[in-house]
């Protein structure tokens, strides 16, 4: 089975893309290290304007869950993890990620018209590779993330009866 056959359906892609966009905004705000659980902290955050544009983000529980899944799955490939973070957390376009990888790419064996030889990959090759890496990353993350959301236990708020 080749990488080209590993595709998600449109519904699956939309589901994981939506969650990863929310997670990326959550990671970008720096909440990975600090947990905002008190009402005062949430109120203060809403009163003080932030210095960066806000985008919709997930809550802390969802963010921590997604981070655990992404870390456990993407630790295999650091390049794919970097591309995933650049795309979802920092909001970089596929083109800007590709142009960065084109700038830092070192020559490697590539098939050319004259045969196989050492060459630096073109920007189009880098764009194709970044697109394939993102698609493969989403495919690899879909099943563990869906399973994690289904298996987690929701903590219901306990109401005290006075």
Put a short name on every predicted segment:
Residues 83-84:
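A short pre-motif secondary-structure segment
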Residues 92-95, 121:
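Residue-level signal for the short linker/turn that defines the boundary of a DNA-recognition helix
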Residues 125, 129:
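Residues in the helix-turn-helix
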Residues 87-91:
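Short helix-to-turn junction characteristic of helix-turn-helix DNA-binding domains
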Residues 95-105:
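Residues within the helices of the helix-turn-helix
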């Amino acid at each position: 089975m080749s990488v080209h056959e590993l595709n998600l359906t449109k519904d699956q892609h939309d589901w994981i893309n939506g969650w990863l966009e929310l997670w990326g905004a959550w990671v970008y705000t720096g909440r990975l290290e600090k947990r905002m659980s008190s009402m005062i902290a949430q109120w203060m955050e809403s009163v003080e304007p932030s210095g960066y544009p806000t985008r919709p983000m997930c809550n802390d529980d969802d963010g921590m869950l997604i981070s655990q899944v992404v870390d456990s799955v993407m630790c295999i490939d650091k390049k794919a993890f970097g591309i995933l973070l650049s795309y979802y957390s920092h909001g970089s376009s596929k083109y800007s990620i590709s142009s960065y990888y084109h700038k830092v790419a070192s020559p490697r064996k590539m098939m050319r018209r004259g045969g196989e030889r050492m060459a630096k990959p073109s920007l189009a090759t880098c764009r194709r590779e970044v697109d394939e890496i993102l698609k493969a990353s989403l495919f690899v993350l879909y099943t563990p993330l869906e399973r994690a959301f289904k298996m987690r236990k929701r903590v219901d708020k306990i109401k005290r009866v006075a």
